[in-house]
Every structure is written in C-alpha cells, then in structure tokens.
Amino acid sequence: MTPRQSSSITKIIRASTILIALFSLAGCLQTQVSTPLALPSPTVGLASPSPTLPPTPTTEATLPPEPSPQPSPIATQNPLPPATMITDIAGHVQTYELGCEASAAVDWAGYYDVLIYESTFQFELPLSDNPELGFVGNVTTDGWGQIPPHAYGVHAPPIAELLREYSLPAVAVKDMTIEDVKAELAEGDPIIAWVIGNMVYSSPIKIYDKEGNAVVVAPYEHVVILVGYDETTITYMNNGFFYSVPTEVFLTSWSVLGNMAVIYD
C-alpha cells in the first residue's frame, strides 16, 4: 500500500468516525425531544363548600292567636230621675159616689187627648157580681164602702178593656213595684191605681162570685191617678185635686188589692 492509499484510508476512517459520532449525537437529541418532560400534576384543591341555602319557608300559615272571649255588654237602663211631676193633666169631681173608676178613667184618657164623658163611660161598663169582670152595684143609687155582692165598684181589667175600645193602649196590671211606678211616671205616663179610701189600709177579703170564681176585694176600694214622685213621697190626683203622701203610706194602701193599676203601654 502506497502512502497515498494509506492516507486515503485514514481519512475515510476518520470521516466514518465523525459520521458515527454525529449520528449518535442526533439520536440523543431526538430522544430528548421526543420524551416529554414529566410535568407535575396540577394540585387538585379542596372543593369549596357549597353556599348555605336559606331555610325554605313553610307553606302553613301561622294563625294569629284567637282573641279571648269578651263578655257581652249588658244593656243598662237609664237611671230614673230623683223626682218627676206630670203637671199638664186635668181632673174633675166624680159625678157618682160609687163612680170613682169611671171618673179617673176619663181624666186619664183626656191626658192623651181622648175626650170621653164620665156618664157615657160608666154606663158602657158591663155589670157583674165579680169586679174583675164588670161593675158591681148600682152607680146611681148605691153608696160607697161595701163589698160584693153588695155595691162595690170595678177592678182594672174591665176599665182597661173599655179604654182600648177608645183606641187607647190601656193595660190592666197587678204586682207592680215602686220602680215600675217611677219608670212610668218618668216617661210622662200617669197611672190609674187602686187603693183604699184616702190612702189608708183595709183588710183584703176573698169572696166567690156566682160561678165560683175567687176574687180579692176590700171595703172602701178607691181609684186615684198617680202623677209624680220624689225621694220620699208619691203625688196623686183625686177628684181634680193633687195630694202627696209618704211613699210607704201609698205602698201600704196600694198593696191591699195586689198593686193593681191601669197603665199606658
């Protein structure tokens, strides 16, 4: 081998060595590029807590508490005045000794502007042996102060019934109280009251009529018109004149025939 050939072979070997080195380097670079770097996985944070929801309102309505039952108001009557007097009533002296009931009845009717003659009213009353049913006695001839079957007079029911025929709202009552009397008078309504004589006492007597009906009577039965009161007295009209007596005196006399009266109702 010539020196020139040897030199050529040496160059070829060097060139091959360089190429091999270059290929090796290129392979390393390719390996580094193709293998991705292991990146750290992203840290998964803790889930944020869900926002707290407000409580769902209940659908059931809250009812207000029931009010406590209150007592019903009690109707109160107006207090009675301490005194009153009916002054615009006129009276007259009775025509017949035994005719006090008819005399008082027509005076009472006149107060309500109803004109009735005493004699007319008297003879329109039915006759009976029972004063609860009609007039007992002969008004033109008999005297006062007896009891049935003798001449006597008449009680409240026949008087009220006849007054109603004159379109007056007359009502016969018994067992009235002094408060009832004051209430009527305070309303401006006079009262026909059955008493004994001039506000005296007499013993009540039970009798029986021909039909066997019992009735309480008293000697000297009399009728007046009550027109006023104050704290201690009752005022009444008798034969057109006015008188005042202690309330207790009136009540004693009035009680004999059971607190009997005719009122405007």
What are these regions (language model features)?
Residues 1-9:
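N-terminal secretory signal peptides that target proteins for export/translocation
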Residues 16-26:
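Bacterial N-terminal signal peptides
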Residues 99, 171-173, 191-195, 225, ...:
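Structural recognition of the beta-strand scaffold that forms the well-ordered cores
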Residues 148, 201, 205-218, 223-265:
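Noncatalytic regulatory segments and standalone regulatory/sensor domains
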Residues 183-189, 228-233:
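A short, structured loop/turn motif at beta-sheet edges
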